[in-house]
Structures are given as C-alpha cells and as structure tokens.
Amino acid sequence: MIHVTRKTQLPEEFTLKKIRFIAGDVFTTMGKPGDASVVFTNDDEVQLLNREYRGIDAPTDVLSFPSDEIDPETDIRYLGDVIISVDKASAQSELARHSLEDELTMLIVHGCLHLTGLDHGTPEEKSFMKEKQESMLKALHIKDYLWPEDH
C-alpha cells in the first residue's frame, strides 16, 4: 500500500487514488512491489530533513529515504519514504510553465525510482534513471518537465 500524508494543500484533482496509482505504477514497472510513504509538505520541513540527513541547509524539491525492510507479520517489503516540498514544486512548475499536478507527478516518479534503487550519481546512472523517468512520465502523458538537478 502507498501511504499518503498531506501536510499542505494540493491541487483538488490530485487525489489520493491518483497519487497511489503513480507510485504503485513505478514500483510495478520496476519489478519492486511493496509499501511506501509519500509525504507532501513545505520548504521548512524539507529543509530540516535535508540538513539533518544530507548536510545541506536548504530546501529541495524531493527527498527519498530508501528502506528494504520486510514486515515480519505481513511479509510485505517496505520500500521507503518520499518527501515532496509542495512549495518548491509550485515554484518549479511556474518556471517550467506546466501545471503543479504535472510537477508533483514528476517528483513522485523521481522519488519512487530512488526507492527502487536507482540513482544519478554518475553520468551512466543519471542517463539510465532519466530514461526510465521519461518513459514513465510519457506513459502518464507528461512530456515537458525539467530534470531535477539538486537532489
């Protein structure tokens, strides 16, 4: 199950069902079924987490905290947490001239790809992750977005 926490306002059309579908689709496509959490919050909270876990005292658009624990009671894998700054997403959507919903979708896909083990630390990793992300966004009918450079 995809657990969703909304600590800030989201677009009305960005429903729990849609959020769960997007994240679940990433995990299914990548062959990594399991549970995860997606949290929508503000710049202040993301900045605190970014400082605490990455040593960067600034907000960012999305943070991913992979896990690979298996619940002993249910035998279901917990893939981790994706934390999204809606403030940052809103600013980026304006810059890219697309909807906040499209930006949030891109950030969910990007964050969930990290939970499946993908990264962009090397040029090869970045190329592979970008290819996967573009393919998934295309399937979701989203084509114009900026690649997140700062996370």
Region annotations inferred by a language model:
Residues 109, 113-117:
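Short active-site segment of divalent metal-dependent hydrolases/proteases
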